[in-house]
């Protein structure tokens, strides 16, 4: 009488587990990088929100305006997001007139100081992204950035010569 084989052998199961382990070895670091990049992108959104404040302050010849005061309705020079804190920094340089020149105003984003607390990726916690505002109003990566290049959003990445 023939016996029918049912199920998988131990060797077959071990091979499947090994394949899953190899796939996970590649997938988990890639996923962690993806999470860090998406969290770092929030900083550029915060900086975009500060553009209006910078434009208002530039009418007074300065990058930074008065500090926040809820009593008087002054919104201040910083914006806190889920993963980071963006602050307006720098000194306005009125001599710059070309659209691609930095105007002296900067936005400094510090990751890990947002409302999410410990839910931020360890790959970007405590890192800074400094954005220089150009005369045309756009932002580009500035000096003082210590965020790894692979996490900097392409929209503001410094152009390599």
UniProtKB/Swiss-Prot annotation:
Q: Name one GO cellular component term.
A: membrane
Which processes are annotated in GO (biological process)? cell adhesion
Main localization of the protein described in the UniProt heading: other
Sites of the modification N-methylphenylalanine? 8
The keyword Transmembrane is annotated on this UniProt entry:
yes
Q: Which cysteine residues pair off into disulfide bonds?
A: 63-105
Instruction: Please name the InterPro entries in this protein's record.
Output: N_methyl_site, Pilin, Pilin-like
Q: Which residues cross the membrane?
A: 8-28
The similarity comment for this entry is: Belongs to the N-Me-Phe pilin family.
Quote the subunit structure annotation.
Answer: The pili are polar flexible filaments of about 5.4 nanometers diameter and 2.5 micrometers average length; they consist of only a single polypeptide chain arranged in a helical configuration of five subunits per turn in the assembled pilus.
> Can you say what this protein is called?
Type IV major fimbrial protein FimA
Q: What is the lineage of its organism?
A: Bacteria, Pseudomonadati, Pseudomonadota, Gammaproteobacteria, Cardiobacteriales
